[in-house]
From Swiss-Prot:
Binding-site positions, Mg(2+): 37, 59
Ranges for domain EngB-type G: 22-198
Designated name of the protein: Probable GTP-binding protein EngB
Names of the cofactor(s): Mg(2+)
Originating gene: engB
Pfam entry (one): MMR_HSR1
Function, as annotated: Necessary for normal cell division and for the maintenance of normal septation.
Keyword line: Cell cycle, Cell division, GTP-binding, Magnesium, Metal-binding, Nucleotide-binding, Septation
Gene Ontology BP annotations: division septum assembly
Molecular-function annotations in GO: GTP binding; metal ion binding
Keyword Cell division recorded: yes
Length: 209
């Protein structure tokens, strides 16, 4: 089953106080222009569920989409886009950071990186920041179609090696992904689906006194 199929827009917020009361959430985040919106549209099989723009930094709010299992997918503002006023960028940083650290419904993070330029400084800072929550991270190396088959294999191997220090501390996984070639959809579904399954199992387990 495609977990993301038939996802529908729910609401958009610009302040933590306006966050909706939801059951469980997984969030998508990445550098501006890393292909986050295209990845969301590909996973949901929807042409314009998330707005795709040639201008980086287009996602400026926290956008909520309801999944068919009743849980939610959250599209977070991209990071690393400098051509906005300092006050606006500071608001994005605070909004993003506070959501990732404080949101109790958040069960995992999907981090989008351009396969041609993975693990840039801000990506590493995001991993360092989020790992303190103990929640899982799944990395989509987007735009994999821009690489040859051999380059894809090499890049995936290198990224896995660089992620070893993180994977020792938390559940972290990585895969190749291409919106153009529809590559990696099933793998992303299985990984994120396992997060929801684990959260549901934990919620239904008897609590110890």
């Amino acid at each position: 089953m495609n977990l993301f199929q038939n996802a529908k827009f729910f609401t958009t917020v610009n302040h933590l106080k306006d966050l909706p009361d939801t059951p469980l959430e997984i969030a998508f985040v990445g550098r501006s222009n890393a292909g986050k919106s295209s990845a969301i549209n590909t996973l949901t099989n929807h042409v314009r569920l998330a707005y795709v723009s040639k201008t980086p930094g287009r996602t400026q709010h926290i956008n909520f989409f309801e999944l068919q299992n009743g849980n939610f997918m959250v599209d977070l503002p991209g990071y690393g886009y400098a051509q906005v006023p300092e006050a606006v960028r500071a608001h994005w940083v605070n909004l993003l950071g506070d959501y990732l650290q404080q949101r109790k419904q958040l069960i995992g993070l999907v981090l989008i990186m351009d396969a041609r330029h993975p693990l840039k400084e801000l990506d590493i800072r995001m991993l360092d920041f989020f790992h303190t929550t103990g929640r899982p991270v799944h990395i989509l190396l987007s735009k994999a179609d821009k690489l040859s088959k051999n380059e894809q294999i090499k890049t995936l191997s290198q990224v896995k090696k660089l992620l070893k220090p993180y994977s020792d501390r938390q559940n972290i996984s990585v895969q190749l992904f291409s919106s153009l070639k529809k590559q990696g959809i099933d793998e992303a579904n299985r990984t994120v689906g396992s997060w929801f399954d684990a959260a549901d199992a934990a919620a239904s387990s008897p609590k110890e006194n």
